[in-house]
Every structure is written in C-alpha cells, then in structure tokens.
Amino acid sequence: MSDFLGIDTSNYTTSAAIYESPHNVLLQEKMLLPVKKGEKGIRQSDAVFHHTVQLPEIIDKLFKKTGKRDISAVGVSYAPRRLEGSYMPCFLTGISAATAVSRALSVPLYRFSHQEGHIAAALYSAGRLELLNEPFIAFHVSGGTTEAVLVNPDNEHIINAEIVASSSDLKAGQAIDRVGVMLSLNFPAGPELERLSEKSNAVFKIKPSMKNADCSLSGVENKCKKMLTENYEKSDIALFCIDSVIAALDGMYKALMPKYGALPVVFSGGVTSNKRIKNYFHDKYNAVFAEPAFSADNAAGTAVLSSIMYDRRK
C-alpha cells in the first residue's frame, strides 16, 4: 500500500486529496463553501453545515477519479496552527470523517495544522520537498492568516513553524476580499480583483505601515474607500490594494533578513496565487511559490505529510 488520503475542511473550502507516493502523483477535489452575494465571510456554524454536506460529495468525486485505492494512512487538518488555543469548529468536520476512515481501514491517522498543509502543498507543487530538511522562511498569506514563520525540521511533526512576523490587524486576504466586495465583486474576491487590476496602468509608490517585522493592513481598506469616493477607476483601486499587500510582505521579509539572513523563502496561501505577487517575489528573491491549484486551501499538503510521517514511523 502506498496511497495516502488527505482531508481539509477550512473556513472556505472542502478538500480531499490522494497522494500516490511511489509515483509522486497527487489527485485532489475541492469545493468552495457558498457565501451570499455582498457578504464578507461565513459563520462557523454555517461552515460546519456546508462541510458536512459537501465532504461526502468531494470524497465520492475523488475516488471516482482515482478508482479503488489501498490507503496506507489518513492525514487531516485539525486546527489553523499548531499552537495552544488555535481552534476553529469547521475543522471538526474533517476530523470526524478522517477518524471514521482511519478506524474502518485500520490505518494510522495523522493530524497536521492547516498552515503545515499549506507549506507542504507549496513545496510539493514547486518540486522542493527537500526544503523540509533545512531551515527556511515560509509566508502563509490568506484570508485568515498573514504570517512569516521560521520553519525548522522536526522529527515529531515534520514541520516546526515559529511565527517571526505577522499582520497586527487585517489579514491580506481580508483586505482583498473587503476591497473586492466594496467594488461589487464576488466573495472570495481574489481572482476577480486580480483580473480587474490588470486593466490598470497606474503606478503607485506605497510605503507599508510597519512595526519591526509586523505590518498593518487596515489602512489599505480605508484608503481604497477614500479612492472610491474620489471616483478613482475601479481597476486602479484594485491595483492599489494588491500593490499595498506586496509592499507589506516585502517590508516583512526585509525586516527579517538582518536576523535570519538569506534563507530560502516559500509562499503559500490563497493570496499568493496572484500573478503580480508571485512575479514580484520570484524576480526579487527567487522565492518558491505553490502552483495555483495548490495555493488556495487544499488537502494536498496533509496527504503528502501523511506519506512522510508514515515512512518515518514504519
């Protein structure tokens, strides 16, 4: 047996994946949770309900795609981060399903944080899993998180992630979604905001709001509101929002370099699927990015991590 099932039930996406270890092939299915037009998020009770409805459908689609599999182990996201007090009810849906599969098949169940899954998915899709054997800086940039973590190899959990920089208020994905909704785009607004920004030729010189290595993004939403009342083109507002996120992330990394040096830098999370963000940091720092299918929330990382954990514990 050499197939590994990953499950992730994050705040906005129901995901499942199968990792074929010998062939390094990963197949996945995922489905966004429904968010009403004009809303800026979803309540946890609604997220749990929709995951409960969608997860069986996702797993059914996955196994119709892969055919019958001999599952060696199951990996699941249990919390946003591997920190005491890190908790969201939406992950309970995935834990319940993963536990049932594990017990029914008499195979191991491994628990990973949602953040660890993002990092592993980025490394897998970029062909850089060897970085798990050395220190590196990982940015996790999404609607729920805007953090830089120092990642060190860990014998027990594979990934040891220490937060070294973060946003002190609004997260990058929140800023993008709020500005997107402000511009009458659908939630989550990232893809539509990116397409809108590509229509702009504006050039902005943006100074990020920083305190040491931490950034503040609340001013981005306020500035975009002001631009809208001043009748700026919506495409220019969209570009300003994205460039403000770039400036903040760049400020965070620059502040970390004197202490940690030029460690490899990895970007994960839905926000990092933005082509402008990817091109900026790849060109400037040779940063490692997840492929678009592995940037947004997914179960690929937990499937890959469960394979690594299984091999370690043989």
Question: What kind of feature is each model-predicted range?
Answer:
Residues 10-49, 157-163, 289:
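Short glycine-rich, Thr/Ser-proximal phosphate-binding strand/loop in the N-terminal lobe
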Residues 118-122, 290-314:
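Glycine-rich phosphate-binding/hydrolytic loop that grips phosphoryl groups
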Residues 2, 9-10, 27-28, 130-134, ...:
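A short helix-loop
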Residues 191-265, 271-282, 286-288, 307-314:
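A contiguous, well-structured pocket-lining segment that forms one wall/lid of small-molecule binding clefts
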Residues 1-2, 107-137, 304-305:
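Conserved phosphate-binding catalytic cores of ATP/NTP-utilizing and phosphoryl-transfer enzymes
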Residues 76-79, 142, 266-274:
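Glycine-rich beta-strand-to-loop/alpha-helix junction loops that act as flexible
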Residues 60-99, 103:
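Short beta-strand-loop/turn "lid" adjacent to the catalytic site in phosphate-handling enzymes
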